[in-house]
Amino acid sequence: MEGNRTENLCNRSFGWLQRQENDVKPWLWKLSNCFSAAEKTLPCSAKTKDYMENQKGVVESKDASSHNAGSKLFPAVPLPDVHPLQQQQIQLSPGPKVSCCAHGSDSCTPQMHCGVGDGSVIHPGTILDSKSTGTITCQVGSGFAFPSASSLKNPPPRSNLAGIASEFPGMCIENSVSSYQHLPCCGKLHFQSCHGNVHKLHQFPALQSCTPSGYFPCSEFTSGATGRLDEHIAQSELTSHVCASPLHLSVAPSVCLKGSHYCSDCLNKPTRNSLVDAAKIWPNIPPPNTQTGPVSIPICNGCGTQGTGNEKSLLLASSLGKSPQKYGSPEVAVAGQVLENLPPIGVFWDIENCSVPTGRSAVAVVQRIREKFFKGHREAEFICVCDISKENKEVIQELNNCQVTVAHINATAKNAADDKLRQSLRRFADTHTAPATVVLVSTDVNFALELSDLRHRHGFRIILVHKNQASEALLHHAHELVCFEEFISDLPPRLPLKMPACHTLLYVYNLPTNRDSKSVSNRLRRLSDNCGGKVLSISGSSAILRFLNQESAERAWKRMENEDVFGNRIVVSFAPKNKELNETKSSNFVGTEKVKSPKKVNRSTKLCITNKDGSDQSSGTKGSAGRGLQSHGSVIKPTNVKSLQELCRLESKTISRNTENHQEHLREIPSQNNSHAAAPVSLTTKKSGVGESSCKSSYKKETSVSRSMTNSPVDKKDKDEAVFQVSYPSAFSKLTASRQLSPLFVSQNCWSSRSMSPNLSNRSSPLTFNVVNHTSGTDCPDPFANGADIQISNIDYRLSRKELQQTLQETFSRHGKVKCVELSPHTDYQLKATVQMENLQEAISAVNSLHRYKIGSKRIQVSLATGAANKSLSLLSSETVSILQDAPACCLPMFKFTEIYEKKFGRKLMVSDLYKLTDTVAIRDQGGGRLVCLLPSSQARQSPLGSSQSHDGSSANCSPIIFEELEYHEPVCKQHCLNKDVIEHEFDPDSYRIPFAILSLKTFAPQVHSLLQTHEGTVPLLSFPDCYMSEFNDLEMVPEGQGGVPLEHLITCVPGVNIATAQNGIKVIKWIHNKPPPPTTVDPWLLRSKSPVGNPQLIQFSREVIDLLKSQPSCIIPVSKFIPTYHHHFAKQCRVSDYGYSKLMELLEAVPHVLQILGMGSKRLLTLTHRAQVKRFTQDLLKLLKSQASKQVIVKEFLQAYHWCFSKDWDVTEYGVCELADIISEIPDTTICLSQQDNEMVICIPKRERTQEEIERTKQFSKEVVDLLRHQPHFRMPFSKFIPSYHHHFGRQCKLAYYGFTKLLELFEAIPEVLQVLECGEEKILTLTEVEQVKAVAAQFVKLLRSQKDNCLMMSDLLSEYSKTFGYTLRLHDYDVSSVPALMQKLCHVVKVVDTESGKQIQLINRKSLRTLTAQLLVLLMSWDGASFLSVEQLKQHYETIHSTSLNPCEYGFMTLTELLKSLPYLVEVFTNGAEEEYVRLTNLYMFAKNVRSLLHTYHYQQIFLHEFLVAYSKYTGEVLQPKAYGCNNLEELLGAIPQVVWIKGHGHKRIVVLKNDMKTRFSSPSFPLADHVDDHGNQLDDHNGHIMETPGSTSSMELSLGTPSNAPNQTEQELLCLTNTSPVDLLCEPVPSCLPSPQLRPDPVVLESADLIQFEERPVPLSEMMILTEEEKQKIVTTAQEKLTSGSVASSTAENTSVPPRHSSETQLNKEAMDSPAKKQHKNKVKLAANFSLAPVTKL
């Protein structure tokens, strides 16, 4: 596409080339030695659309790729070496005579003649009509007219010779012009681009034995010049032009590349880095994704003539929009070889094993494979195997574009991909012979056998691309190994392949109204279903359908037109009816019509402007497609619209016409609105952008721009309310409003006061000034008539400007004529350039090819600068200023700015456009993102309070109100000022002294509003005391430091009032919105200024300012002392440049939300704003209240409480007010609560009673906090990082309401036992309490020692090993120790220090089993029948009493017994009952377990059938068991929740609930009350003294065990047997109750020494020693035992009047069962002989 570019292609010029066209004689163009005389031509029509057929996907023909598929498309034949050609001896066939050229190295060269004539028409089908001659004669001239499919009617005029190279790319001269730098007979040639869409291509008639050399585009030639093309070739190379067929192996290798010929001198020249881009020849064919590198080939440039440096190589096949050649790109060829003679190479890719990385380009992978391995080879196979349904669709598409065969297999079949690849490898070996190369991309060892055969049996060269974990068996068979990870290490990201969503609408009319909409919708859906239509809406007799693209919509229009829908013939149209677009409303402007909402029109006529023939699209068309049909004014109804192309053309005409109408309407605006400077103009237009309507109601209620300019009642109402409005600034009259209204802007229906304001250097007024340029052009010409601009960014600024300009010139000139290259100045390291191309097509080609092209060390960003975009830059500039002026410090993060812009103006922001506003904004890289900052030249002077939002506080729905700077204001009030002779220019600001006053805001605020009312909304600050005194009484002035507050600060504390600075430097008191605030306004001071969100440096500076001023008396410091005070306070310099400013005052004004500048001149003072003071007081007050035990304080005691909390006296002026009530009233009720108690005002924190569930969740949250902080260095983290860390650690949000809190800090304060919040200045740090830190470091030591050999570590190595293991050092001072041994003392429950020969060694202690201890403690608690709880100390004493051993928690890994019990949260609860002593009790679930244990103790062998459990439990406890009360669904689940107590054995209805062996032991001691007694079971024996003795009920035996006295631990237990009741009838004679299971006898446990279980005792008790107890003796035994129980005396070994046989020592042990699971229990024999049945009643007869 070398449009109109003149190149000197020869070192000589010929005069006959300069002749006029009428003097031109026809010349013959001889192609005689390109074809044999004996060969015949083939018809042209048969191959007309072969190039289209070759675009089919490779997946469909993956296994049968044609051998000559690629050779049909511009085969890139490599240039052979001259010397091998000369060595070959070939029989030549007779050829035509040729003439000689003086420039050739040999004497005989063929000549080609091209004549030029007028009026000649050549039909492609008759180009070759002779069978017997080798000469082709064709005339080329200005009268040429080839049949064309181009849709363009009027291509640009051409001069000189129409580009031969671009118009005949398929003939033998296809590349001669663009490639030859030597055309001795042509002189100068002018290249011209192809305009329009892709033209139909006609194949050159192929000879029978020769491959076709190319295709002809049918294009239009408008002008031309004579030219004679003589090509020179050595005689030794003559035979290479006879036949181009690769099948004729007997013929010498051809040196003709697509019809180009070379002389031997040129072939012997060294290569040059040159490039001729394909877009110059085929401009409208989109280039494929595959970019093959060029090989530089010397081209005939005439003998002794040097070639220019802007060509790279010959034509690249991959850049022509066609499939790459079968045998690769031209670079894979080696000189002296023909493609067929090159060894074949095949690539076999297991893409499931070696996949393309996510988000990376498969094109780049294929390209690298071809570049690395294909040199000197021809591509014979390139296949990858995968399940295309499982693979990424974009990867598959990219592989198809690269002409890679994608073989589909079923992923569910085992080794399906491997089998397919192995089959392909075998086929490759059968087809090709050595030498051949196989490239396998896989790591699967299954290919080892195939690779071995290919290498050793077939002699192939094997290249293996594998991953790191490849097997040695696979690697052994490869000649060359390539690591896949390194091979794809720096792949470029994948560019999005999807086209932007572009929907097309169809409008259907004449639908039946007597049918329901659902039926009509179904009918329409059936009609349009084949075309992918979707019914959007049905309204009355019309409907709207949406289609994905233009073609689908046109097919549906043809199908649906005049179709029958329930008896009605429907009408289908691409555009809505005229009445929908042109609804007029009454207006003061004549001829103004109702315009449909831009949003609706955008929705209804959003057109997909694509090129059917596949021409390139510029990136600029994405945003400009489908702006709608209407502009301001009337819209012409499109008549007989048959296609969307016509609609597009109609749209451009309509916009042009409506622009004229709009200009006429604008001229009708009353002139006084713009001419009279004193008349305020109040327009209530709302800002809206493209695609956003001014009013988002139905189209009948929408108003046009012109209607909003009229004097509507709304406008009048606003004017009446705005009593005190600032007049039109006179400065505006000095500026010219030279803004042109682009068609894009007109069609937006928006008139932004901020965007149209000409005063960009100052803050715009809240009033709306419509400054319109009436001289804007009505007939807008083609925006690209004078060329297309290309914007280039991300340029390497390290390169010199000269080098950059030259590089850009050369790079872009390859794609077309470059008019100029402009470089922007180096600004903030953002160097940008603008390249102007000759026409749009060249610019599009350059953008597509050079985007992300690497120049220097950076990849440039290339975008097309459309005309509309250029003209809207002024609009974007004003919109950007309007947003950034309202931002703190005039800076916003890029993401925040984009969000505000799109929400405010309703359209997408092109970030690249921001870089074009070099005179308005600067974009800096800061932190993790980019910052958009307004340049000082565009900034307005900030008022001390910054800007304000509207009263509703919503910046999303309406534009924030910006403070205007008054152009001029009188320095004093002429009416009330005592010194009325003040002259402005003689006033010295340094003489102004800031007055201090003592005033209550409660009375002062209404007085200030009253003053503003009487002074028409503005009062000069200088005369405010005089005005106040005239209206009210004198101000109570005090000297500085005498308990007063600066008057200027007090005024800003008044809601709705602000102090602005006029341009003459005078401070003026005024209302924020030029009128009194409404009574329902939210506190306006909260809305005055915003924190600099996203600017971390300014945020940090604002915190430093607060911290600095807090330390100053009354929070006031002079400006002159700020720098030294800052340096002294923070021990660092305050460098203004670090924050992006050049002056200190600019930096101070950048934080108006915290800093207020008082006074004028050099004696200005700095203080905190009222907002910052309220926030600071709120924090201090909360800290004070939380320090009180009752979380409240009486107002009278506030001074004392403040002094006690902060160690300083209370001074209300420290917070910028004169009374405590003034600042307390500013705090929301949700933070502080004021209440009246006993005639005293009390300040307290509002509390909400939390539910029990929330309390339980808070306990769980405390454990989560401990877990989270244990993973942090030093068990601490910043407060601000807790929420994201919590979300990342637990995978869920931390919802405060879930725990019953509204603030995170309050939630932390609810868990003081595990977490404490430390305040380090303004930053809060979360850390574990000391106890939790010790636990955490103990856990770390356990982990550390267990990772060491022998679980021990030398003490000297502890700190280094700790740092190595956990990544941070161990800070001993965190644990209040100064040495490692001292820390070990605190961790004595975890580790112990042992002295060894090599030094002190740290070892883990041997912990005892916590499970055994848990069971023992559980039995103790279940046997306790006193209160429902007992103290921890009592539990420890009882344990030591029962088990006769001390309970040391350290032996179990705990510091205290309380911590041990807290580690069993599901078994016991530890609590404090209002005192310091801690108590323990069973949980609700284990209270149920206690009842179950007691119940099972009443049964034989402590077991019961499961189906009888509910009834027995209800009888035993007297209550119905509800499993859901314990969080279980059924009884079985409930019993399974207490595995420490019971277990269920058996199956089906025979399941039995069995008491665990650990729970069967029952203790009784004088100091430990007996449990397990219930009144209604008859299990208690009452004697006449009222004593109670426990007996097991419902059993056939009774056992009473007296506890062993503490002073005689080795004394044997005495067992007394008695009958269960006083009845004289023996229980054995009684019938067995039906509810009891059959009795079973079980012996006492036998000691291990007794090996023989059936052996009788060595000393049996004689019967004479046994005696029968009478009833009286029994009663005495019971009485005596009970007395001993109650008195706590030691039980004697014998009872009175009772002879008890002494028990064997083996019987002193308790009933011990296996402590493990019941499965370990020994099997019971059915027959048990000679055992000690202690449970049976002993009866002597």
Curated annotation (Swiss-Prot):
Domain HTH OST-type: 872-946, 1000-1076, 1097-1171, 1173-1248, 1257-1332, 1333-1408, 1409-1483, 1484-1558
Span of domain NYN: 345-482
Disulfide bonds: none
Protein name: Meiosis regulator and mRNA stability factor 1
CDD domains (alphabetical): LOTUS_1_Limkain_b1 (cd09977), LOTUS_2_Limkain_b1 (cd09978), LOTUS_3_Limkain_b1 (cd09979), LOTUS_4_Limkain_b1 (cd09980), LOTUS_5_Limkain_b1 (cd09981), LOTUS_6_Limkain_b1 (cd09982), LOTUS_7_Limkain_b1 (cd09983), LOTUS_8_Limkain_b1 (cd09984)
Pfam families the record matches: MARF1_LOTUS, NYN, OST-HTH, RRM_MARF1
Disordered: annotated segments: 594-636, 659-678, 683-716, 1684-1727
Biased composition annotated in UniProt, kind: Polar residues: 1684-1700
InterPro entries found in the cross-reference section: LOTUS-like, Marf1, MARF1_LOTUS, MARF1_RRM1, MARF1_RRM2, Nucleotide-bd_a/b_plait_sf, NYN, OST-HTH/LOTUS_dom
A Gene Ontology cellular-component term: peroxisome
Compositional bias per record (Basic and acidic residues), positions renumbered to this chain: 659-668
Keyword vocabulary terms for this entry: Differentiation, Meiosis, Oogenesis, Peroxisome, Repeat, RNA-binding
MF GO annotations: CCR4-NOT complex binding; RNA binding; RNA nuclease activity
PANTHER family: LIMKAIN B LKAP (PTHR14379), MEIOSIS REGULATOR AND MRNA STABILITY FACTOR 1 (PTHR14379:SF3)
Coiled coil: none
Native source organism of the sequence: Gallus gallus
Stated role: Essential regulator of oogenesis required for female meiotic progression to repress transposable elements and preventing their mobilization, which is essential for the germline integrity.
TM spans (from-to): none
Domain named RRM: residues: 788-867
Subcellular location: Peroxisome
